[in-house]
């Protein structure tokens, strides 16, 4: 087990406060995030049965569909209750993205669909990406998700309270600093710009880095509809928002409107035994 520890507020948030599994299954924008993440990853995944390391994999919500697709999945997460739940899906251990308990050149795919969210120190993010690159095989895939720099701006409009002084000031600080201190509601978090994510993956030695908007530019319309009295967003609205996410992919200027970003890159061939 790693001696590194996440910020106590992050551990409390995921260990005691929030159910990350239900977030991606119950809310409309959460379901969009889950389906689009599957859709994007399946474009780049090698054929099953390849070996996948799910770093920060939570309760195994992504491991679950990967196992069903025929992949051999191992999961690492810092939160013990997540690991306990994920163990019903695949082998799972407590560990930290910055110090993975795995040998070099072991996995065909390493995915970090959460760890970068809660590492505001760039040195920590670089260490996590370097570890992902280390344990991936030459030619292997590394995929990393990030919260978009502007996500909170769109989100708090959907709740119709961005104009209140406290929320306005809080979101303004996130836009200025890219960091939320976790003082209320959400926990300590970092918010990426797309070009920054490309730079960070490249600095870890990855090649052919590409970034996608996961939910696309219309997710906040779906979330706003869900806040209104009644039955929530229609299937037609969700389908249109999903189509908008796909249509937006060729246009990098639309990345800033997505709630989350997904970056993919490959480990250079001939780099066995490296440690960035």
Predicted regions mapped to residue ranges:
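Conserved class I S-adenosyl-L-methionine
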Residues: 1-48, 61, 65, 85, 141-174
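Class I SAM-dependent methyltransferase SAM/SAH-binding core
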Residues: 53, 60-99
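A short acidic, Gly/Pro-enriched loop at the edge of an enzyme's catalytic core
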Residues: 98-110
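A short SAM/SAH-binding and catalytic strip from SAM-dependent methyltransferases
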Residues: 109-123
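A short glycine-rich, Lys/Arg-flanked "PGG" loop and its adjoining helix->strand segment in the class I
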Residues: 126-141
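Short alpha-helix
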Residues: 188-205, 211
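C-terminal lobe and adjacent flexible extensions of AdoMet/dcAdoMet transferase-like proteins
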Residues: 204, 210-276
């Amino acid at each position: 087990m790693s001696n590194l520890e996440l910020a106590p507020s992050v551990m409390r948030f995921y260990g005691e406060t929030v159910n990350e599994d239900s977030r991606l299954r119950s809310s409309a924008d959460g379901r969009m995030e889950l389906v689009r993440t599957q859709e994007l990853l399946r474009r780049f995944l090698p054929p099953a049965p390849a070996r996948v390391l799910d770093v920060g994999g939570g309760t195994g919500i992504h491991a679950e569909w990967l196992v069903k697709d025929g992949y051999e999945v191992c999961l690492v997460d810092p939160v013990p209750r997540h690991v306990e739940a994920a163990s019903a899906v695949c082998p799972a251990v407590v560990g930290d993205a910055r110090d993975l308990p795995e040998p070099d050149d072991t996995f065909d795919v390493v995915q970090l669909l959460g760890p970068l969210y809660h590492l505001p120190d760039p040195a920590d993010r670089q260490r996590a990406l370097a570890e992902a690159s280390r344990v991936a095989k030459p030619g292997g895939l590394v995929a990393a998700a990030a919260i978009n720099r502007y996500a909170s701006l769109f989100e708090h409009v959907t709740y119709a309270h961005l104009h209140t002084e406290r929320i306005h000031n809080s979101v303004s600080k996130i836009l200025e600093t890219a960091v939320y201190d976790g003082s209320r509601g959400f926990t300590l978090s970092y918010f990426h710009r797309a070009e920054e994510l490309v730079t960070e993956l490249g600095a870890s030695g990855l090649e052919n880095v590409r970034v996608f908007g996961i939910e696309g530019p219309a997710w906040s319309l779906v979330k706003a509809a869900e806040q209104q009295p009644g039955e929530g967003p229609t299937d037609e609205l969700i389908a249109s928002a999903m189509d908008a996410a796909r249509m937006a992919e060729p246009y990098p200027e639309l990345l800033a409107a997505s709630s989350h970003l997904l970056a993919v890159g490959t480990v250079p061939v001939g780099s066995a035994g490296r440690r960035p």
